[in-house]
């Protein structure tokens, strides 16, 4: 793979929950002269999924998207790249086409808002004359070279983190976790996703609409759980499909594990095969997956997100607290690169 070139990237503080992203008219007027004909790339969204957070999720994933499109239009951009998720297909299993979905139901409110956002952005960009490319990553993991977590606590790392948090209890009892051992989960290294995004960005002839940023193959849940058990020292954990949580038969630790890992049911219980019409073929072997599990467990046990010198909590204007890390010696104006949940990228 060729190295990504990020020369000329400038970070501008903004807030997707505010009109015009909180940017001043003066700034937009100035930038319009430089940005005309450019491409607007929208990463930011909320990964919250619980019903109790519906207002916050909608504010970020729906209203925030409206505000972003308004700014892209005001800047006279030609194209809009929207980073969505491969799981807008909801409870559907099997083949997943690169098209807009209207599933019968969703696994959680996060999936529902991201699906609604894809339909919304399609209409908005069409009305404003913006060429639209929707990028759908699957479960994003660390870079393929180092396999480090980068401080991420979501996706695969969230699942491992919850199991590690309960490790003291899980070591001494037999526990059955809800999941389909025969199902497959699609994991994709973050640098592969970035290369897909840049490929779509650099190709003016790319087809409008959804494009999957996914691996060519799935990882079997039974194999993934076995790797986690081996490297975490949890031989008594088993995975099987449970029709419902039985409060009388299931142990307290099983009920607790079910609650804390509820978000991951959509990837541990059903298999999705994502269509990928163009781009490189990304394949993850068992040895690759094991390296990721080893790094994730190591990060949990060492307490290191990614070995920052300093860690603080920042509360930006959008009210979503973020972990802020500093590493090395700051001898110039600092720069930060983050995704929608402030994970370093």
Task: Indicate residue ranges for each PLM-predicted region.
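Glycine-rich phosphate-binding loop and adjoining beta1-alpha1-beta2 segment
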Residues: 1-9
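NAD(P)H-binding glycine-rich loop region in Rossmannoid oxidoreductase-like domains
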Residues: 5, 13-63, 75
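Conserved Rossmann-fold NAD(P)-dependent oxidoreductase catalytic core, especially the SDR/UDP-sugar
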Residues: 39-44, 51-55, 59, 63-109, ...
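A conserved pocket-lining segment of Rossmann-fold NAD(P)-dependent short-chain dehydrogenase/reductase
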Residues: 53, 146, 156-192, 196-200
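Active-site Tyr-X1-5-Lys
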Residues: 107-138
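Glycine/proline-rich active-site loop of Rossmann-fold NAD(P)-dependent oxidoreductases
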Residues: 143-156, 200-211
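Conserved C-terminal active-site "lid" loop/helix of NAD(P)H-dependent oxidoreductases
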Residues: 190, 222-223, 248-282
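Mid/C-terminal beta-alpha module of Rossmann-like enzyme folds, strongest
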Residues: 196-259, 293-339, 343-345
């Amino acid at each position: 793979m060729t190295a990504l070139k990020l020369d000329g990237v400038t970070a501008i503080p903004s807030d997707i929950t505010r009109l015009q992203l909180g940017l001043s008219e003066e700034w937009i007027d100035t930038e319009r002269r430089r940005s005309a004909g450019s491409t607007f790339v929208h990463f930011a969204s909320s990964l919250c999924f619980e019903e109790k957070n519906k207002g916050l999720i909608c504010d970020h994933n729906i209203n925030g998207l409206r505000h972003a499109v308004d700014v892209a239009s005001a800047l006279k951009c030609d194209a809009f790249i929207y980073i969505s998720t491969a799981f807008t297909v909801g409870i559907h299993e099997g083949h997943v086409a690169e098209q807009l979905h209207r599933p019968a139901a969703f696994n959680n409110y996060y999936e529902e808002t991201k699906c609604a956002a894809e339909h919304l952005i399609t209409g908005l960009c069409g009305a404003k004359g913006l060429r639209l490319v929707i990028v759908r990553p699957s479960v994003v993991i660390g870079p393929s070279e180092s396999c480090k977590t980068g401080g991420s606590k979501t996706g695969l790392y969230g699942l491992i983190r919850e199991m590690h948090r309960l490790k003291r209890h899980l070591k001494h009892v037999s526990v059955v976790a809800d999941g389909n051992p025969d199902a497959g989960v699609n994991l994709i290294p973050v640098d592969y996703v970035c290369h897909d995004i840049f490929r779509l960005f650099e190709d003016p002839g790319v087809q409008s609409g959804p494009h999957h940023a996914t691996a060519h193959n799935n990882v079997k849940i039974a194999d993934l759980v076995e790797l986690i058990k081996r490297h975490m020292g949890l031989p008594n954990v088993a995975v099987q499909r449970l029709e419902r949580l039985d409060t009388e038969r299931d142990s307290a630790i099983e009920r607790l594990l079910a609650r804390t890992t509820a978000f991951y049911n959509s990837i541990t219980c059903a298999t999705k095969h994502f269509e990928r019409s163009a781009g490189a073929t990304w394949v993850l072997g068992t040895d690759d997956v094991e390296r990721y599990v080893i790094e994730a467990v190591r990060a949990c046990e060492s307490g290191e997100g990614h070995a920052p010198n300093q860690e603080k909590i920042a509360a930006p204007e959008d009210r979503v607290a973020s972990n802020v890390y500093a590493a090395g010696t700051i001898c110039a104006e600092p720069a930060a690169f983050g995704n929608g949940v402030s994970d370093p990228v």
